[in-house]
């Protein structure tokens, strides 16, 4: 009987310990939830987080323009090359984002409301154009290596970008004329589709170029570096555009995932860090190598 009593006591003790652990976990979850809500609802924390984003974007923009100047000093005899345009667009996109986040609270109260959507969405469109340019560059290299004509690539690049901008402008105009929830959903879903298209572009041409480079001997250090460069950039850009696509789908239908409001600063910080700041920083670092001086090798120039 004493043994039975010990077992009952032990069982009761374990139950109390388990209940106590569950209570502690629930309390921790509640505290975490309260912390998240407190930060989201605090104007001071909202401004701090938005200003941190502004600083980070400013740093990326500064790095891009420094790299642009270095390239210009290295090969001043060339005009606007693909590499120069890529760094210039990075400078512009990140610079505009920095300014928007510095004045994020003012942007939120701009009237008419369509101006808010334009200021928050234009950098995203420019980001798409910037990295679509990288896809174009890789597609040209891939087809040139296979002795296939690349005459149709640049017109396709400009046509795709023109269609994206025209459709987005049309959505803005309709949203201005009739600001209903359905139009906001359509706008976000359209951009989710654009992001998915960009992700697939990186997967298609980055993957093709990577596989093509793999077939060549990789004894040379330069070719091995190029293989790593293409692999890393493809992975980074595919991932960031895929995350953007998924997040836009959530934001379209769930108010809790809305990024165009002041009271979601933590979500804004995580989102923009993952889909723009980190990818841009990593790509700029990976592509930091300066072009060869004139006479060493060919250099791709935008015509």
Swiss-Prot record:
Topological domain ranges for the Extracellular compartment: 1-48, 104-117, 178-183, 254-265
Membrane topology designation: Multi-pass membrane protein
Record's subcellular location: Vacuole membrane
Cellular-component GO terms for this entry: plant-type vacuole membrane
TM segment ranges: 49-69, 83-103, 118-138, 157-177, 184-204, 233-253, 266-286
Keyword annotations: Host-virus interaction, Membrane, Transmembrane, Transmembrane helix, Vacuole
Residues exposed to the Cytoplasmic side: 70-82, 139-156, 205-232, 287-303
Record carries keyword Ribosomal protein: no
BP GO annotations: viral replication complex formation and maintenance
Top-level lineage group: Eukaryota
UniProt note: phenotype after gene disruption: When associated with TOM1 disruption, reduced efficiency of intracellular multiplication of tobamoviruses (e.g. crucifer strain TMV-Cg), characterized by a reduced accumulation of viral coat protein (CP) and reduced amplification of TMV-related RNAs.
Keyword Transmembrane: yes
Its biological purpose: Contributes to the intracellular multiplication of tobamoviruses, probably being a membrane anchor promoting the formation of the replication complex.
Subunit composition and interactions: Constituent of tobamovirus replication complex. Interacts with the helicase domain of tobamovirus-encoded replication proteins.
Record PANTHER family: TOBAMOVIRUS MULTIPLICATION PROTEIN 1-LIKE ISOFORM X1, TOBAMOVIRUS MULTIPLICATION PROTEIN 3
Family according to the record: Belongs to the plant tobamovirus multiplication TOM1 protein family.
Record-given protein name: Tobamovirus multiplication protein 3
Source organism: Arabidopsis thaliana
């Amino acid at each position: 009987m004493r043994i039975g009593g010990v077992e009952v006591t032990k069982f009761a003790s374990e139950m109390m310990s388990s209940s106590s652990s569950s209570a502690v976990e629930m309390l921790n979850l509640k505290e975490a939830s309260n912390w998240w809500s407190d930060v989201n609802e605090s104007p001071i924390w909202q401004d701090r987080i938005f200003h941190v984003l502004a600083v980070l974007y400013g740093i990326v923009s500064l790095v891009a323009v420094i790299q642009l100047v270095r390239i210009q000093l290295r090969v001043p005899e060339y005009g606007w090359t693909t590499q120069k345009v890529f760094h210039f667009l990075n400078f512009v996109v990140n610079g505009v984002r920095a300014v928007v986040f510095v004045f994020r609270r003012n942007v939120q109260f701009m009237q008419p409301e369509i101006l808010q959507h334009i200021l928050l969405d234009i950098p995203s469109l420019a980001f798409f154009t910037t990295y679509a340019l990288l896809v174009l560059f890789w597609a040209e290299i891939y087809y040139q290596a296979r002795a296939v004509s690349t005459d149709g690539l640049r017109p396709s690049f400009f046509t795709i970008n023109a269609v994206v901008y025209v459709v987005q402008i049309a959505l803005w105009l309709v949203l201005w004329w009739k600001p209903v929830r359905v139009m906001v959903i359509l706008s976000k879903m359209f951009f989710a589709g654009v992001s998915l298209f960009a992700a697939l572009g990186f997967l298609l041409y980055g993957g093709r170029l990577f596989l093509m480079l793999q077939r060549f001997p990789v004894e040379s250090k330069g070719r091995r570096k190029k293989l790593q460069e293409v692999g890393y950039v493809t992975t980074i850009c595919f991932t960031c555009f895929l995350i953007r696509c998924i997040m836009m789908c959530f934001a379209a239908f769930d108010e809790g995932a809305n990024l165009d409001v002041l009271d979601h600063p933590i979500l804004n910080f995580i989102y923009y860090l993952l889909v723009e700041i980190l990818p841009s920083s990593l790509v700029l670092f990976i592509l930091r190598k300066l072009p060869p001086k004139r006479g060493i090798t060919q250099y791709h120039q935008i015509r």
